Amino acid sequence: MINVSTSPRQTLDWTALKPADGSPAVEWRISDSPVPYPEAVATMEARAAAIAAGEATELVWLLEHPPLYTAGTSGHASDLLEERFPLFTTGRGGQLTYHGPGQRVAYVMLDLKRRRPDVRAYVAALEQWIIATLDAFNIRCERREDRVGVWVRRPDKGVGYEDKIAAIGVRLKRWVSLHGIAINVEPDLSHFKAIVPCGISDPRYGVTSLVDLGLPVVMTDVDIALRAAFENIFGETRAAAPAGI
């Protein structure tokens, strides 16, 4: 099992993540109702195990959670400032973050052994996926060497100010990826104030969303952009079956 934390890293080549020609398309599933966190993790882990065993195809699962906080493998209890919502300890890399309505979570279950067994290149590919997705809305986002996630410069707030618009936290088991990304579309940003998001306490670095930046988008718009950008980086997708994961 491999976890990816927020330790400093070099920007790595994210290309060559597409599978070999003739590989099955990645299933693309969207849940319309909020999914409880324990249920989502159990479902994701079962599917990842089936992928590793060659019994299921790869999957991207888009969903929202009810309001909650998660602590990754580098999380610290002191980063929870207020106990507003349930806190779940999880196996992904990273520290504390908030999930809730208005945030698009994408759980990505890919067989990196078939694609490219390079965990840091995979994280860079996830960053590029987010950057390409938000570029469809004319939002210029950037990655940072010392801060995992995707950031937007905020000169309106002051020199050197940046806000995180999307978070990344992954885990690999038998080279199958678990967890994934979270893009802030229209969440209640005040809930991030109850934690030290991703362990970053510097006041120059905050949190934003598409709507906070003045874009009148809805979740469906983001889902369409996510799928198009994903296919350019990771390969073809197909709609998942109506029932089951």
From Swiss-Prot:
It is found in: Cytoplasm. The record marks 164 as: Lowers pKa of active site Cys. One of its GO terms (cellular component) is cytoplasm. SUPFAM superfamilies: Class II aaRS and biotin synthetases (SSF55681). It comes from the Bacteria. One of its GO terms (molecular function) is lipoyl(octanoyl) transferase activity. Pathway: Protein modification; protein lipoylation via endogenous pathway; protein N(6)-(lipoyl)lysine from octanoyl-[acyl-carrier-protein]: step 1/2. Residues 54-238 form the BPL/LPL catalytic domain. The keyword Endoplasmic reticulum does not apply. The keyword Nucleotide-binding does not apply. Its EC number is 2.3.1.181. Substrate binds at residues 92-99, 167-169, 180-182. It catalyses: octanoyl-[ACP] + L-lysyl-[protein] = N(6)-octanoyl-L-lysyl-[protein] + holo-[ACP] + H(+). Keywords: Acyltransferase, Cytoplasm, Transferase. InterPro entries: aa-tRNA-synth_II/BPL/LPL, BPL_LPL_catalytic, Octanoyltransferase, Octanoyltransferase_CS. GO terms for biological process: protein modification process. The active site is at 198 (acyl-thioester intermediate). Belongs to the LipB family. In the reaction, the free carboxyl group of octanoic acid is attached via an amide linkage to the epsilon-amino group of a specific lysine residue of lipoyl domains of lipoate-dependent enzymes. NCBIfam families: lipB, PRK14341.1, PRK14345.1. Catalyzes the transfer of endogenously produced octanoic acid from octanoyl-acyl-carrier-protein onto the lipoyl domains of lipoate-dependent enzymes. Lipoyl-ACP can also act as a substrate although octanoyl-ACP is likely to be the physiological substrate. This is Octanoyltransferase. It comes from Rhodopseudomonas palustris (strain TIE-1).
